[in-house]
A protein has these predicted regions:
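Short glycine-centered segments of the SAM/dcSAM-binding site in methyltransferase folds
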Residues: 81-83, 106
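Helix-to-beta-strand junctions that scaffold the AdoMet/dcAdoMet cofactor pocket
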Residues: 77-79
């Protein structure tokens, strides 16, 4: 689970919500659990059904920039749920509008926060209520860090360090 997903888990818990974290990697699901996720589900063909067995989703926030998550979200959502898309897949995304209309789903896009929301998030972080998983990488290893990011191997956020940090 990437950095945005990790923050989302924590913010949802602070808001009193039940959180079901979804990811393709077991280690990232384990991290989500330590950050407060109530349940963790492996992102595979049965994920939507598994989420329904847990009571279904009243809302889904998708940070993954891939189209493969769309059918899973539709299967996971209860009637009148809201789906928030923040990850932007390359190319077009096709789906059956019938499911959205018939079940009264709301699909929203979100790309940024405003100053007030950022200030609130920073205050939560400064108070230790929201934690980031940070991977410090020397600038000389920027290419390796980018390869790891593209391969989905990075948990949280990667921060490039300049010079000697010892």
């Amino acid at each position: 689970m990437g950095g945005l997903g990790q923050y989302c888990v924590q913010l949802a818990k602070l808001s009193g919500l039940r959180v079901i974290a979804v990811d393709v990697a077991d280690d990232k699901l384990a991290t989500a659990k330590t950050l407060g996720a109530d349940e963790c589900v492996k992102a595979d063909e049965g994920a939507g059904a598994a989420i329904q067995e847990l009571g279904g989703a009243h809302g889904c926030v998708n940070f993954a920039p891939v189209t493969a998550t769309w059918p899973m979200m539709l299967d996971a959502c209860n009637p009148r749920a809201t789906i928030v898309l923040t990850g932007v897949p390359a190319g077009e995304m096709a789906f059956y509008t019938y499911q959205v209309v018939e079940r009264g789903l709301m699909v929203r896009g979100s790309s940024a926060s405003n100053r007030q929301e950022m200030a609130e998030l920073l205050a939560l972080a400064a108070g230790g209520r929201v934690k980031g998983v940070i991977n410090a990488v020397p600038f000389a290893q920027i290419n390796e860090a980018l390869l790891d990011l593209n391969a989905g191997k990075v948990e949280g956020r990667t921060v490039l360090t300049m010079g000697d940090t010892s």
